[in-house]
Amino acid sequence: MSSDWDEIKRLAADFQKAQLTSTLQKLSERNCIEIVTLLLEKQLLDVVFTNDGKEYITPEHLEREIQDELYANGGRANLVEVSKTLNVDLSRIEALAERIAADNPQIHLMLGQLIDEDYITHIAQEINEKLSQRGEISISDLTSQFDLPSEFLQHNVMEKHLGKTIKGRQDATNPRVFFTQAYIQRCKAKIRGALAAITKPTNVSVILQQINVQEKIFHSLLDEIMPAGQVTSKQANAQYVPHIYAKTQAEWVNSFYKQNSFLEYEAINKLGISDAKAYIRKQFPNEQFLFLKRVALGAHLIELTVVSALNECSATKQYLDLATILPSNLSEEDIEEAFDAVMAQKHCNPSQFVYLQSIVFSQAYLTQLIQPCHDMAHALAKAAIDSGAYQQYIVEKTLAQKGSNSSANFDADDDGKVDKRDERRKKAASGKAGGGAQGRETKTKSTKKHQRGRAAAHNHDSDDDEETTQQSAGSSRKSVKPLELVKSSDVINRIKSTLEEEGLEHLAKPIAGLFVNQLNQAALAKAQELYEATPQTNRRQTHAAIQERVNTLLVDLRLYEKGIKLFNTDTQAQLIKYLLKSLGNDICNELTLYVAAECSLSVKMTNLNVDQRIKLIQECDAQYRNALLEQNKALNKSIEDFELATEAVLKTCSMIIKKADKKKDRALIVSHKEKLMQQLSECREPALLLHLAALILFTTITGCILHASGKFVSTILQHIRPTLNESQNALLLRYHDLVLQMLQQGTTDSPESKSLNEQLQTLQAEVVDLAQNFSRVSVSKAD
């Protein structure tokens, strides 16, 4: 090591000698570089190279230059700028800056900047000057101004120089806010002056805008000022209410309530009080009020005036005009609301009164008023029986109920889609039956031809799971309107004269509306009583009609079964299930309702499901019960089982079972097809049109009729496909695909839906023509 040092000394001496000698004896730049490199390799020299590598400097000298830059920049130097100025790598500058900050407590390294105490003192002086001008300052403002961390400004500047360089104090509620005492005094003076000048409720925001004081300072100084008023809250919409105004408000409210025993919310709101109900409760803590929508009624007004008057009205069996005992400025709605509230509070028995247009009638008064109308209702019931109007109503109602029962039911898989299918549901047509005598030994003949033909095409839903085939056996049915024996005009004419004497004739119509249904029901009950007292021949006619109707449905069932047997086993099972749930359900309803009537059971519903029928059957006589229960169970079995169960029920009801007649069956099939064609010619809905066309073609090709819902259309088309030629099959397949696409669209307003509808309209005439004009002869020619 000593030899190396001796060599270095020798080289240094040679270097000095070379500098003192002439140019020819100086070291070259290369030699100088080699010497410095050798010193660095032997770690005998520590230097810092510039970024361009042309110069180098010792760390001590670089440290002095950094401090010089800090001084030259006023005590705050950005290390990035220092690196650019000194042309030294930033990492070297940062390392030396950390050492400078660690060695010198007067210098701070903060966010890549060197800051000395002189600069901190300087910004403290600036902050003090700004604070003296504004009176209040926050750390957030200083952070944005000086671009320094808030914590550094908080602890190293503000709190360190507070009370020394910075003349002010720190907010106790918010340590990041500083202000001067003079500023606080000015704010107090502004607030005190503004509040002293206010004589009516004023929004706090308006006050702050006028005096230019922050809201938080306003609320913090408000208690110290002790103003002659109060602030409603510390929310954005708070108001300052001076005591003098509150006193005036209270005096007005007390005076009005003392004179009238009620208070209007609108009048209180006009005084500047937003929550009238809360103010009333606060102003009258010991008073009981009935709070309505527009007014608050005092308890003594209710107890001493309204309740006592109502009790007197009930006791005297008269009526009461509430408008005459309540304040005149209450509207009719207010009076009605007050009456409802009194009834709700159980001050009086609600069932004893009827309210009509501010007039309260006691039930006893109305009962006496309507009493003559009961005699009129009985007279009208007798007149309906004598004229046959009630008997006609009973027949029409029975046929309508049967028609509803024989309408095709929805398939079990489509229960969730009832709404869409109901929109397209049509009423089925009913068959007309002839009369006959009751008894097993007497055969009954039909007096008219069976007019049947099932509207066997029906509702298609959006998933192409369409339901359902409508069945008809005669002219189309319409829903029967309830029989109106007692009309509103009859009641009005009967009570109007009595009301005119009291000056209440304008209430004749509302009163009649209250009792017309009751009187009509009484008249219908009387008519039913008279009807049941008529000769037994009426019962025999009903027996014959039910017998004819059930036999007609059984014939339909057998004819539909023939068509079902043409399909494969799986499809047969589905079609049989659907047939029994629709047509079989109608037969069960017919017989169950007939037996219920024979057993004197009252049945309000006519379209019963299995559970409802079973519940009703349990109440019937024992002689019918087992047969009816077996019939209901047979709905889930085969058609043969159901027919046997139905025949057993017919025998228990003393009804005759007709034998099959092939000639009549052929006529019925032709009639059914004609009905379908008539519906097809009138149909405009593509899905229903395709359904009808498929059923007509099936009947034409097979000679059998079919009871199938819309979801079986594709199965029917597949079954008749071999009988049709290629063009006919292509037409039906194309129309079927377009129908499916239209149902899947879901909306009729889109361009795609309009385009599909146009295509369907184009093909509609061809489909109708194919269904109406197709025959077996044409099939043979095509083949």
UniProtKB/Swiss-Prot annotation:
Report whether Hydrolase shows up as a keyword of the record.
no
One MF term in the entry's GO annotations: UFM1 ligase activity
Q: Where is this region: Disordered?
A: 404-482
Q: InterPro entries attached here?
A: Ufl1, Ufl1-like_C, Ufl1_dom, Ufl1_N
Q: Any idea which UniProt keywords this protein has? A: Transferase, Ubl conjugation pathway
BP GO annotations? protein K69-linked ufmylation; regulation of proteasomal ubiquitin-dependent protein catabolic process; response to endoplasmic reticulum stress
Question: According to its UniProt record, what is one Pfam family this protein matches?
Answer: UFL1
Q: Where is the composition biased (Basic residues)?
A: 445-457
- Can you name a GO cellular component term? endoplasmic reticulum membrane
EC number per UniProt = 2.3.2.-
Q: What does this protein do?
A: E3 UFM1-protein ligase that mediates ufmylation of target proteins.
Query: Which PANTHER family would you find in this protein's record?
Result: E3 UFM1-PROTEIN LIGASE 1
- Give the UniProt family note: Belongs to the UFL1 family.
Name listed for the protein in its UniProt record:
E3 UFM1-protein ligase 1 homolog
Q: Which organism is it from?
A: Drosophila mojavensis
What lineage does UniProt assign to this protein's organism? Eukaryota, Metazoa, Ecdysozoa, Arthropoda, Hexapoda
